[in-house]
Amino acid sequence: MRVTTSFPLGTLRDTPSEAEIISHQLLLKGGYIRRVNSGIYAYMPIMLKVIEKISNIIEKELNNNGCSKLLLPQLHPAELWKRSERWEGYTAGEGIMFNLKDRQGKEFGLAPTHEEVITNIASEIINSYKQLPLCFYQIQTKFRDEIRPRFGLMRSREFIMKDGYSFHSSKEDLSSFYEKMERSYENIFKNCGLDTVGVDADSGAIGGAASKEFMVTADAGEDYILFTESGSYAANIEKAISLPSKEIPLKSFETEWLETPNQKSIVDICKENDLDASQIVKVVIFVAKFENKSQLPILTCIRGDQHINEIKLFNLISKKYSSNLISLEIIEDNATIEKNLTNFPLGYIGPDINDEVIKNSSSWDKSWIRIADHSANNLSSFVSGSNKVNFHKVFQTFSFIDNQFLISDIRNAKKGDRISLESNEELKEKRGIEIGHIFQLGQKYSEKLNAKFSDKDGKLKNLWMGCYGIGVTRIAQAAIEQNHDENGISWPIQISPFEILIIPTNLKDPYQTKLTEEIYKEFESKKIDVLLDDRDVRAGVKFKDADLIGIPFQIIIGRDSINKEVEFICRSSKRKIKISSQNLLEKFISESKILYNENS
């Protein structure tokens, strides 16, 4: 393709102020995307080439796996989502689904995901175990009503995603296919030239028994990965489990009561009373809000040097009390406290606070749901709030109240924790960008949407389901995070918009013009993905743009064209060689093979 006639470049000289991370900056500066509004971008021709190459890699792998491509509607009737009991959670409060009403007043949502629609279709077309397993996938634009769109295509309101859904006759068949898809995902990301790590993950709003995320390691990642050096364990911070550091034994006190005037924080209590945070149990209050409008007050206890993992807590409450949990909100503002709590000593709350303080609430249930993390429950003695302003208490054990408590892991694992009693391995931490996620959904959706099949004995059973997502546009931006330098992008050759860029420095020179056309036509005839920068601009502008847009190889045609010689440059290594145009094609083929092999 020629820049002047079919592939205009829209590069920028200045870095847009809106772009916080390098990959977003380079996508804008390189002319790959154009901002239309907050979190909404146009994909320019050069970006569309990248997207198509990523999509082709995905399609090839999934088709080889026996999956069938389809295209599902983006506009979903609310009725389907209400049957799955996800409508309220996705549209109320901070829900991420754009929703609207048509002329007849019927409710619809713009799809962030397609479990409901595909399950409804499966209920109509799958009748017998003989049709199973089946897997469908699509590559399509998705929508999310992000509260704060940021980082370009990483957290946008529109994005391109591959989502797949499999249907099975048994849990065992689902598990087997899930492992098969895990291997396929590893192949896809490898063939995109990415360095990824698979980690155990939380299933979130999608649900299901098991899930795994695939992360690109990068400093700009919003997620944290906890892992062992040996590779024996890896999980995202929402899912990771570990053993906290050993607490410091509590010294003996002459009195059970500690006077702690204006000492509401753990830092203040430790400083004024010569204590360590591991000797304190902190109490954190939440309210759990459900789709049926009920609200449960949650009292949680955790060791003072640890932090509550709200994802783990959300999942625990959802599993124990109701799967229709919409939100979990920490209670620390005065307005909510005054409305729902009586004589509530914020900053001095103890684990044994009674139910009387919530009896006058008009919206909350009238008794605490009490949950303690293992780190609190395992303490032999500790300091905590006394339920009286300006006083804390020394508790000898947690056992005198633990029969009221649900004991569970609700703690954030962190760097430096041991992974188990049997191992001395410690967790390490790095940032990651999620580009893929696979789930074993089980029968969650088939039960609610009545998707059944007849087994070998003619009995009707619920389908077993899996779902499998890949962020196509996320892959493109994540690849830049892993492959760039001070001058611009350096694409993995597999997903680069072009394999090679031809740059004549002066098209007014007849020798350059003639040699340029000869090389361009030769490469095109061999089906090589080549771009010719035939703009009438200074050579320096072309060189700067070439490094910015990041095509793996460059051919510079300059004064030596009179001798049929050119300069051949590898973008990633910055290696330059002078070579005869006669040997150029052979050199490109051998060098490109090296890059394809390195990146796959």
Curated annotation (Swiss-Prot):
Its main location: cytoplasm. InterPro entries: aa-tRNA-synt_IIb (IPR002314), aa-tRNA-synth_II (IPR006195), aa-tRNA-synth_II/BPL/LPL (IPR045864), Anticodon-bd (IPR004154), Anticodon-bd_dom_sf (IPR036621), Pro-tRNA-ligase_IIa (IPR002316), Pro-tRNA-synth_IIa_bac-type (IPR004500), Pro-tRNA-Synthase_IIa_type1 (IPR023717). This is Proline--tRNA ligase. GO terms for cellular component: cytosol. SUPFAM superfamilies: Class II aaRS ABD-related, Class II aaRS and biotin synthetases, YbaK/ProRS associated domain. Homodimer. Its EC number is 6.1.1.15. It catalyses: tRNA(Pro) + L-proline + ATP = L-prolyl-tRNA(Pro) + AMP + diphosphate. Pfam families: HGTP_anticodon, tRNA-synt_2b. Belongs to the class-II aminoacyl-tRNA synthetase family. ProS type 1 subfamily. Catalyzes the attachment of proline to tRNA(Pro) in a two-step reaction: proline is first activated by ATP to form Pro-AMP and then transferred to the acceptor end of tRNA(Pro). As ProRS can inadvertently accommodate and process non-cognate amino acids such as alanine and cysteine, to avoid such errors it has two additional distinct editing activities against alanine. One activity is designated as 'pretransfer' editing and involves the tRNA(Pro)-independent hydrolysis of activated Ala-AMP. It comes from Prochlorococcus marinus (strain MIT 9515).
